[in-house]
Amino acid sequence: HPSLAGWYITEEFHDGSYPVGWQQEPALSMLANYLQTVAAYVKSKSPKEVCIAPALWRGMPADLCGKWFGKIFAQTPDIDVLYLQDIGGRCLVDFDVDLPNWFAEIKKACDANGVIFGVDIESFKECWCPRITMRTKPWTELEEQLRVAGMFTDHITNFSWATFKPGTDTYEGYKKYLEGK
C-alpha cells in the first residue's frame, strides 16, 4: 500500500519548552542535524519519502511556531512529509480557533521548504485538567478534527493506541453515526 512506502523517523519532538525544549539555538540546529542525518542515511538505503510526526504543543504563538518549523526544514532537505500531531485528544484545544491558526503557519513553512503538510489527528481523549482518563472520543468531535485538518491538507492519518482496538465499538459506532446523519 502506498501509505506504507517510505521512512518514518519515530522520535517525537514538539514546539514546547518542557522539559527543555528545541526552541532556541543550539538545540534547534542540533534537532535539525539529527533529523537530517537520519533522513539522509535512510534515503541512502532506499530513496523513499521520509516522514516525521512531531506534536503540536502550541508552546509558542502560531506565527513563531511556523517560523520555528521553517528553520528546521531549511536544515533538513531530506525530510519530505510532516504529519503534525494535532494534540486534539489532550483537551484545552479549540479545533475551530487554535488549530487553523497553527496549521496555516506551519503549512506555510512546509510549502516554503518543499515539505508535504499532513495532520495526524488524535482520536482518543485524555486530559489532566479536568481529569479524564484515556477513552474514545465522540464522533462529532472526531468529525470536527477531520474537517479542520481537511481545510489544510488531504494528508490525514490517525493516532490512537486505545480507541481503535477490538471491543471498543469504534468501527460499528462510526458506521452508525454516519448512517444517522
Spans of features found by a protein language model:
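Glycan-processing catalytic domains of CAZymes
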Residues: 1-181
